[in-house]
């Protein structure tokens, strides 16, 4: 997903189009000339429908779901089985933020690293929608962040 596509998907008219087309065949949505940014809307409809079972919180909050990141994401059920708890956690590979969201329920503060600037923006937006105020998304590689930080984490 490009930054331009992300910005487009954040627009109110496009969010409404996604909402109005949930439940429709994504191919029909893509071919519908009345739908603004039909291809983008169709892709979001497709992945939101798939998120109903894999990422139900993301579906309920109508998060933005880049296809590749969705395919690589842990399911919420799998992420919930992580047992650690404590004060601070570091997620080295944020992606959509599924693991960071689960960690945020067990830790006071979570730092989630994502090196892709667009995916970092997507994750930050989605985590805000999901109410994860204690999760901070940082756009950096794990190597860069670990070399620069002096902070200590209870769990990495």
Language-model segments: residues:
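SAM-dependent transferase fold signal centered on methyltransferase-like domains
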Residues: 1-156
